[in-house]
Amino acid sequence: MMQLLAAVLGAPDGDLVTALPGFNASWPFKVYSGYLSVPGPFELNSYDSLSIHYQLHTSQRDPAKDPLVTWHQGGPGGSSINVGLYTEMGYFSLDDKGGHANPFAW
């Protein structure tokens, strides 16, 4: 995994998230969401390639100087994104009224 991250020079502009459903306010950071291709021949359920989904939320202070924190949570699927990123320590919180900034974000 670290080899994959070491090869990334920056998040592609096409992965920049500019709006989220239910969240109408602006936020003081950038959000990227996309897929990283995993090279190699695979014999996994007849697939010939694999991808890993990522979300990058830049620092609210100084993204060029602040350290990059990676967080990996189990899954499978979207449950790990929703539970951890939107209810534990991420920049956003979700409730029955929609999305809002998380005042306790890392």
Where are these regions (language model features)?
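Detector for methionine-enriched segments
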Residues: 1-2, 89
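Catalytic-loop region of hydrolases
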Residues: 2-68
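N-terminal cap/lid subdomain of alpha/beta-hydrolase-fold enzymes
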Residues: 49-106
